[in-house]
From Swiss-Prot:
Transmembrane segments: none annotated. Residues 218-228, 243-255 have a biased composition (Low complexity). Directly regulates filament dynamics and has been implicated in a number of complex developmental and morphological processes, including mRNA localization and the establishment of cell polarity. It comes from Pongo abelii (Sumatran orangutan). The modification N-acetylalanine is found at residue 2. Residues 216-255, 278-318 are annotated as: Disordered. This is Adenylyl cyclase-associated protein 1. The modification N6-acetyllysine is found at residue 81. Gene3D superfamilies: 2.160.20.70, Adenylate cyclase-associated CAP, N-terminal domain. It is a peripheral membrane protein. Residues 229-242 have a biased composition (Pro residues). The modification Phosphotyrosine is found at residue 31. InterPro entries: Adenylate_cyclase-assoc_CAP, Adenylate_cyclase-assoc_CAP_C, Adenylate_cyclase-assoc_CAP_N, C-CAP_CF_C-like, CAP/MinC_C, CAP_C_sf, CAP_CS_C, CAP_CS_N.
Length: 475
């Protein structure tokens, strides 16, 4: 039955793609489309099928979830439509120089920044894991600037998203299937894009070999007030005609120069003899008359950036937060505080610690999970956690469990010391993209023995699969 269901789903997706290719004239109107799709490049039509398939499904489910997820999805959709406009341009024009290419990529780059900024501005969102999954992977749209391996770049971004989509699945798999479908739809965008790149743009964005050199995107998304503005000013007067006499003089001088060169050794007959009294190293008086020697040109050095005369405005300091919001303890923007304590905890509560610097925090009682995000020099002591303690985007963090914790996750962190209790020796340490990690195990005397977490690995192909082992470094 499961095989039959999978077959039906594959057939439905195939039909959807065929319909997209056949009826793309009704889609994405105003984003580089011509009235007729008969002349559209094949890889543009296939990209349209991606928009009509996984992207449309992702937008549909995001709309059903609503809120921040829907707003985020609309931003992603805009980025994909900008990318489609670039594909249309590439199919019709030749590749421009690098400095001009960066101008063509600027709209996509700005849209990527907007998607990432939205996540940063909504850290208190209940759907923060959804926003993080999108924010961590949206840079996959930059594959158009990646050569010679754009496909692996997209896969890397997709893998980054899975760190957060796994958390969405864990949270909603038994609660709301809609969020599970959302994860499948979103990740399928990037897996389908990888297959698309492999077929049409294996070593980089494929540009036309004919046509004009690309200067601007063909059919950028038009805003609602696109037609209300005044017409652009007329072009300025043409530059004055270049004098032809200078060109003829230059040509004549060049001819004379070649004529002299062609004389060969006889050219030296026109040289004058220089006697000793005309040489500065033989006649000191002549050297004194000529004044100080001019120094040669200085070697090239990169221009130093000009310093602004006006002082830079001070960075706005965010207010410190320590409060219970629903079931979430928020500890944010704490600096140089050494006595923070959370006491009234419950099993269903979670703690989110964000942008705390040189601060120590103690969490008493039993809590569901703890997340440490973007913190520096943080000391965290807690009793019991039934879920996971996660440290991400941080540095020089020390955590100590007094009771029990099943899992400690360390991601994108440089410097982490995890002090385990005797009751938590079976704790799993999961790490990724991190360094300088140490686990400290208690001894009978009350001290701790320090054990570094491996950071270097060796992977070999054994004929059937990849086998990865820790690399021991003798120091």
């Amino acid at each position: 039955m499961a095989d039959m269901q999978n077959l039906v789903e594959r057939l439905e997706r195939a039909v959807g793609r065929l319909e997209a290719v056949s009826h793309t004239s009704d889609m994405h109107r105003g984003y580089g489309d011509s009235p007729s799709k008969a002349g559209a490049a094949p890889y543009v039509q296939v990209f349209d099928s991606l928009l009509a398939g996984p992207v449309a499904e992702y937008l549909k489910i995001s709309k059903e979830i609503g809120g921040d997820v829907q707003k985020h999805a609309e931003m992603v959709h805009t980025g994909l439509k900008l990318e489609r406009a670039l594909l249309v341009t590439a199919s019709q024009c030749q590749q421009p120089a690098d400095n001009k290419l960066s101008d063509l990529l600027a709209p996509i780059s700005e849209q990527i920044k907007e998607v990432i900024t939205f996540r940063e501005k909504n850290r208190g969102s209940k759907l923060f894991n959804h926003l993080s999954a999108v924010s961590e992977s949206i840079q996959a749209l930059g594959w158009v600037a990646m050569a010679p391996k754009p496909g692996p770049y997209v896969k890397e971004m997709n893998d980054a998203a899975m760190f957060y989509t796994n958390r969405v699945l864990k949270e909603y798999k038994d609660v709301d299937k809609k969020h599970v479908d959302w994860v499948k739809a979103y990740l399928s965008i990037w897996t389908e894009l990888q297959a698309y790149i492999k077929e049409f743009h294996t070593t980089g964005l494929a540009w036309s070999k004919t046509g004009p050199v690309a200067k601007e995107l063909s059919g950028l998304p038009s805003g609602p007030s696109a037609g209300s503005g005044p017409p652009p000013p007329p072009p300025g007067p043409p530059p004055p005609p270049v004098s032809t006499s200078s060109g003829s003089d230059e040509s004549a001088s060049r001819s004379a120069l070649f004529a002299q060169i062609n004389q060969g050794e006889s050219i030296t007959h026109a040289l004058k003899h220089v006697s000793d009294d005309m040489k500065t190293h033989k006649n000191p008086a002549l050297k004194a008359q000529s004044g100080p020697l001019r120094s040669g040109p200085k070697p090239f050095s990169a221009p130093k950036p000009q310093t602004s005369q006006s002082p830079k405005p001070a960075t706005k300091k965010e207010p410190a937060v320590l409060e219970l919001e629903g079931k979430k303890w928020r500890v944010e923007n704490q600096e140089n505080v050494s006595n923070l304590v959370i006491e009234d905890t419950e099993l269903k509560q979670v703690a989110y610690i964000y942008k705390c610097v040189s601060t120590t925090l103690q969490i008493k009682g039993k809590i569901n999970s703890i997340t440490v995000d973007n913190c520096k020099k943080l000391g965290l002591v807690f009793d019991d956690v039934v879920g996971i303690v996660e440290i991400i985007n941080s540095g020089d963090v020390k955590v100590q469990v007094m009771g029990k914790v099943p899992t400690i996750s360390i991601n994108k962190t440089d410097g982490c010391h995890a002090y385990l209790s005797k009751n938590s020796l079976d704790c799993e340490i999961v790490s990724a993209k991190s360094s300088e990690m140490n686990v400290l195990i208690p001894t009978e005397g009350g001290d701790f023995n320090e054990f570094p977490v491996p950071e270097q690995f060796k992977t070999l192909w054994n004929g059937q699969k990849l086998v990865t082992t820790v690399t021991e470094i003798a120091g």
